[in-house]
Amino acid sequence: MSYTLLRMTPADAPLTVEWMVRQYGFDRTEVEMWVCDLHFNWSLSVKAVDDKGNVIGLLNMSDYRIEEETAQIQKDNPDLLARLNSQRYTAVFSFIVREDYRGTHLNYDMMMEIMPELKAHYDFIFIPVLHRLKTHGYWQRWGAREFYRDSDCVYYQLKM
C-alpha cells in the first residue's frame, strides 16, 4: 500500500465536504458553511493519495477557537477557557481515512507530516470528538487529555 501525502489548499474544500457528508452523515449545507467559516488551516491540512490517484485520507486542521466549537464552556468554566486561549493552538477539524486503510500506518504518517510545524508554532492541538465516534482511544494513545465535555463532544488537548 503505497501513498503520497500532499498539503491541501482551498481548492480541496469540496473534497472535504464530500468526505465529511459521506463519513459522518452531516448535512451538506451545514458542512459547506463550516468549511467557509471555521478558519481552515489549509497549509497544515493533509490529504493522502494512493498510487492510482485516489484520495484515501484527509486530515483537516482549523484555527477556529474553542468557544466557536462549544459556547457552553464560556458559561461552565470561563477560567479554563481563558487559560487555554492564552496559548497558541490549532484544531483537528476532521481526520478521515478510507476504511481499507484503517489500522495501517497512514494515520500516523499523516500526523507526522505536520508534526514539525505543530511543535514549532503551537502549544497544543485542540481535538473535539463526537461522543458517537470511535476515535477517543486513538487520540488518548497520542497522549491527548480530556479537558471538557458537553452534550455533543469530548474535547481533548494534545500538548506539543
Where are these regions (language model features)?
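Short hydrophobic/aromatic beta-strand element in the GNAT-like acyltransferase core
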Residues: S43-K47, L58, Y89, S94, ...
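Conserved acyl-donor/pantetheine-binding loop and adjacent beta-alpha core of acyl/acetyltransferases
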Residues: N60-S94
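Conserved acetyl-CoA-binding loop-helix of GNAT-fold acetyltransferases
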Residues: S94-V97, G103-P116
